[in-house]
């Protein structure tokens, strides 16, 4: 019936699935942003996030390092670098970064540290 078609049409309007190819396009755009503005901290931070989504964790760490070098109080960069380190098994570095993120105002970082250390004991 007509109402069924209308209903199924609305369910198809949900958020389109993002593919790895889309992330590669974004990463290429961010490469250009960084070339044009090498001191733009969010270029590195966002490219680090995209690299993480693409499972290129080493590249993500390098970009978070650069973002932190450019902006030493960039809490979100410490937070994401900490999570990446923990994911890669660099627990000590990860916890140190999460602790710094907590000091800089991301209170949820402390909850992650607590959960992580509770399960590791």
Identify the role of each PLM range.
Residues 1-121:
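Alpha-helical tetratricopeptide repeat
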């Amino acid at each position: 019936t007509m109402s069924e078609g209308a209903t199924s049409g609305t369910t198809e309007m949900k958020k389109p699935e993002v593919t790895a190819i889309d992330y590669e396009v974004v990463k290429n755009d961010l490469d250009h942003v960084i070339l044009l503005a090498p001191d733009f901290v969010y270029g590195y931070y966002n490219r680090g996030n995209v690299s993480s989504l693409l499972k290129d964790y080493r590249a993500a760490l390098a970009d978070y390092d650069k973002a932190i070098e450019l902006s030493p109080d960039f809490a979100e960069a410490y937070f994401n670098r900490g999570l990446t380190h923990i994911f890669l098994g660099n627990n000590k570095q990860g916890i140190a970064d999460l602790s710094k993120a907590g000091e800089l105002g991301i209170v949820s970082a402390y909850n992650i540290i607590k959960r992580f250390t509770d399960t590791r004991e």
